[in-house]
Amino acid sequence: MAMTEQQKFKVLADQIKISNQLDAEILNSGELTRIDVSNKNRTWEFHITLPQFLAHEDYLLFINAIEQEFKDIANVTCRFTVTNGTNQDEHAIKYFGHCIDQTALSPKVKGQLKQKKLIMSGKVLKVMVSNDIERNHFDKACNGSLIKAFRNCGFDIDKIIFETNDNDQEQNLASLEAHIQEEDEQSARLATEKLEKMKAEKAKQQDNNESAVDKCQIGKPIQIENIKPIESIIEEEFKVAIEGVIFDINLKELKSGRHIVEIKVTDYTDSLVLKMFTRKNKDDLEHFKALSVGKWVRAQGRIEEDTFIRDLVMMMSDIEEIKKATKKDKAEEKRVEFHLHTAMSQMDGIPNIGAYVKQAADWGHPAIAVTDHNVVQAFPDAHAAAEKHGIKMIYGMEGMLVDDGVPIAYKPQDVVLKDATYVVFDVETTGLSNQYDKIIELAAVKVHNGEIIDKFERFSNPHERLSETIINLTHITDDMLVDAPEIEEVLTEFKEWVGDAIFVAHNASFDMGFIDTGYERLGFGPSTNGVIDTLELSRTINTEYGKHGLNFLAKKYGVELTQHHRAIYDTEATAYIFIKMVQQMKELGVLNHNEINKKLSNEDAYKRARPSHVTLIVQNQQGLKNLFKIVSASLVKYFYRTPRIPRSLLDEYREGLLVGTACDEGELFTAVMQKDQSQVEKIAKYYDFIEIQPPALYQDLIDRELIRDTETLHEIYQRLIHAGDTAGIPVIATGNAHYLFEHDGIARKILIASQPGNPLNRSTLPEAHFRTTDEMLNEFHFLGEEKAHEIVVKNTNELADRIERVVPIKDELYTPRMEGANEEIRELSYANARKLYGEDLPQIVIDRLEKELKSIIGNGFAVIYLISQRLVKKSLDDGYLVGSRGSVGSSFVATMTEITEVNPLPPHYICPNCKTSEFFNDGSVGSGFDLPDKTCETCGAPLIKEGQDIPFETFLGFKGDKVPDIDLNFSGEYQPNAHNYTKVLFGEDKVFRAGTIGTVAEKTAFGYVKGYLNDQGIHKRGAEIDRLVKGCTGVKRTTGQHPGGIIVVPDYMDIYDFTPIQYPADDQNSAWMTTHFDFHSIHDNVLKLDILGHDDPTMIRMLQDLSGIDPKTIPVDDKEVMQIFSTPESLGVTEDEILCKTGTFGVPEFGTGFVRQMLEDTKPTTFSELVQISGLSHGTDVWLGNAQELIKTGICDLSSVIGCRDDIMVYLMYAGLEPSMAFKIMESVRKGKGLTEEMIETMKENEVPDWYLDSCLKIKYMFPKAHAAAYVLMAVRIAYFKVHHPLYYYASYFTIRASDFDLITMIKDKTSIRNTVKDMYSRYMDLGKKEKDVLTVLEIMNEMAHRGYRMQPISLEKSQAFEFIIEGDTLIPPFISVPGLGENVAKRIVEARDDGPFLSKEDLNKKAGLSQKIIEYLDELGSLPNLPDKAQLSIFDM
């Protein structure tokens, strides 16, 4: 008997295992009507009829299940028919995102489209878009495919319409009013519900309700024996169990109200994405919320291919949080780590210092040190972490120690160089250590009177097999040495042959080390012969060379080097080079061996020295300041490829510091390899403690054959310990940690691999994790239990006890002193107030001044105001306006001292003649600029209109004790002058640029990870790549400087009381030094001036120069200017011509597409409304989903929504709230913290409307009104020129603000330009950044063209280098506007033109250096009319 269609559907549901997931009615009534099969295309299309829509999550589950079931047979699609689609409008919204995913749009555009609002009307689906550009693009790109996707899901849809919000005609006035009332009621309900919810939560906390979920447990318990490593998961599987630690978690609410959690976990073999939907009628959400990064979970589920991320994921059925045993330090007595590197060790250390400090505290360590490479930038965070975790912080650094001058000549002899006999020699050895390795070849030539007069060449038998490395390097084999004499015989013969000649060698310290060691073992004692090192000699007399290797010098001196790294050949080449060097020394006046070091020494000698690592530990507060001085000098005065610390510098500032021997690259470790024990002990006495590090860290030295074997390494340890015991210096075991745990080491490998020139790339990196006491004791077990305990535990604790508590950061603000600052600010404030308001000041002016001056002077801030006043005055005197940023415009004292143009008093009139004033204190007027024009009733003069109604509290806090942050916008071209003026005010050694630290960003880290995996031939899934990226992110990469921040050190202190100093990015040619600490670390300790560069003041200056109009005289309420914010009519153009409903293209703050849309929505007509828009556009969750909806629905208008942070305080005070509560509410809302229960109750008591409370609850960040007002003031002035002086405006705009030009289009007629703009709008979603920048310029050009003005081509005769110039009704572009033509070339063209006309294109190329591509562009532009390719020579030129 044949199955019915309903039975077929049930069988299908059972087969794909979702029967228990479907609603009973759907399961029983669903029908599988047919299956269309195409064997050719391997496709099956299931046609399914359902009585109602599947819930969206169930639909996705169904689709996923059916695709998985038949994936090996065919590509499956489904087409649904829904018989009862009465609620399809509700489901369309939920299915919208899925249907978008079925289109061919790019992921970015899909994401934008998913944010749009849907309205379903019958069989028509309306998608509300922001503007015409989006409407045209979406309609063209996806209309058909989107309809198909909806129909396949069962929707009965005829068409989809993309509409802008302005075309929404669905509501008539009556329904609008009803909707407004409904919104009011809904807002009231929301606020009440919020209040009740808060009360309930508070009560819940008080009752300590035990039902709250604090540990995730969903589904069945998972058997531990079923757990498998994540790395073993390589294909889809039905049921798998894993466990891992969470390193990323994302909990997302779906439109259905259900949630999906996406977790990324790792077990350090690999990583995996885990997903799970919340189940119906379960408390899964609360369990998900209990999860967080760092927690371990055990999970079980199905492994499947996720089609979106194209990777394997686990769809979890069960998950449980587990306790994972953490690494413990089980030793009874804990050690102290004295050597570790944080993320501030550039591209080398991994964790921040806080992670180390927490781990040390968890292990019970009494103290911990930080010793980053060459820097101390972790100190501020180290201090904070130590205070938090209650552990002693030891501050230090691993630096690069160099001898002040590396000698060229050793053991000076009174011998005339031209008469001397020289033995130029070279040794080949079994390794680099003269203490543990042996000479296998000794070769020399004797030189006299500039000629080689004798030769010496001997092999010696080392009685050991040569390594492959040595054989490959020297081409000497074991067979060549079998019958060679003993080294004793060779050296005895050699000593006799040398006589009293002067030794010469390239890198003589190496070769002489082997000779002297050999002589001493034979009982001869060290050589007494004079020595000359040709390597150091070349570095001194050939400073222009970047290299000084024998190969390089042989080429430079024209000497043949037959076979490098064979002693006899190296020796002969060195001899001929040296003969020429003797002549160079003669020319430099060096005639005697004992004159070489003296006459050839120079202040750059530190550059020649080979740096040794040294550990510097701060013992007390004096030591901290001395370390700051050492760090500064190494970064500023002695930087050469790396920061260097001359020994004399360390000696000068050694007080308060403990000096340690550091790692295998330290001076003492090298001495053990190269010198006898007496010399080692002599060197050891320079240090305060000796470090030895775990053998595991030195395995690389054995692998590279720098140390023979483990036994030799152990002997080196014994010699170091013996040196310490003999000298009475503590020997401590240090870990040289670069990361926390073993599994973190991969991140360091990736970072090191990203640096091709890093010497660490040459070898396998050792395990450099933060070791426990147990691990360290185990590393040194070969020393015996007692000795291991002494160096690991006893000595490290005793050394830590010798160190005092040190605080690297000050705990208060230290401002500069300026004599009479308090009196000057008071006098200046009152003097200017009387100029404006008259001798008999209004009480409101006196009250505001006294209120502010009490806070400013009482808290020591007068000097900050006075400094700002001086800077602004200097700029104004030099002809450049200054715009204020931030909240400084909230201060009336700042207004009266001319720091800002924003007047924060309530709106008011002032008579410029008789000084009569009238204030509006009731909140009825938003800005004084919006007051109607009025004449003085006393004298008839036109009244000045002022006042923005901004409370002082938004600047210095309610108590007036917050450190003022005065940000000033200087002209970009004047900014360097303002910076330099601070040196005049305070002295060059008291001002520094605010330093910044640049770390590895996520995108950069991703590139490092991918590069490393590709180089290693390793494939990792996306989740593991994400984990590795996180491990590399945040590591210091470089340093920089704040764009405008200047740090001012008070005259009674110096910079080293606060921070070391350096050049940004170690650029020794930089004009300014910066703070070594990131300026945020010392923000509360020293004054920071924000002297920023901005285009607006520069543009105002150019407009003033062109027009002769003083910008301060421009009316702020010009009606035609105000009109452009809602229509382009006052520009003499139509919306259709310029493709825009406003006239604000190119107006600062109001020219972007986002703000233009706001203008279209709000149609502002007043200055205060423009300030509102500025605030709304800069805030977060202030406009979108908040004020925008309130205005659209008519609940309130633009003037009454919350736009700027100050509006809240002013509004609430007018509503009757106490100023302190109004301030608290403003601060809470602007920081995104919402409202407390007390705040809500107080607002309700004062009849604040519910919509206002609801709006406050949504806001995440708010803009200060003073900042907005300053920006709008500048914008209105520039708009004035746009309306009334168009060509001045366009010339200034293109010169100052535009960056990318399409001159080919710009010189065309207005119709062509408009068509180009329209075409770019249609392709907007696909435009790159550069094309979008070009579009911005073309929008302005289109507007200019439709106003009757034209752009000429570049003119070889008239164009300037950088400025657009006006000629009649046209503009002539500058050379810099040509794509690809740089500043230097632009200058060169003008300079070459001044020398005479260009005769040909060839002449243009030669004189101005223009490339052929640029010349072709100028030709196409029509800029080279009648200019021949080459100059034609006529008879008359002869």
UniProtKB/Swiss-Prot annotation:
Biological process annotations from GO: DNA-templated DNA replication
Hydrolase as UniProt keyword: yes
SUPFAM superfamilies membership: PsbU/PolX domain-like, Ribonuclease H-like
Annotated ranges, domain Exonuclease: 422-578
Regions crossing the membrane: none
The family this protein is said to belong to: Belongs to the DNA polymerase type-C family. PolC subfamily.
The protein's name in its UniProt record: DNA polymerase III PolC-type
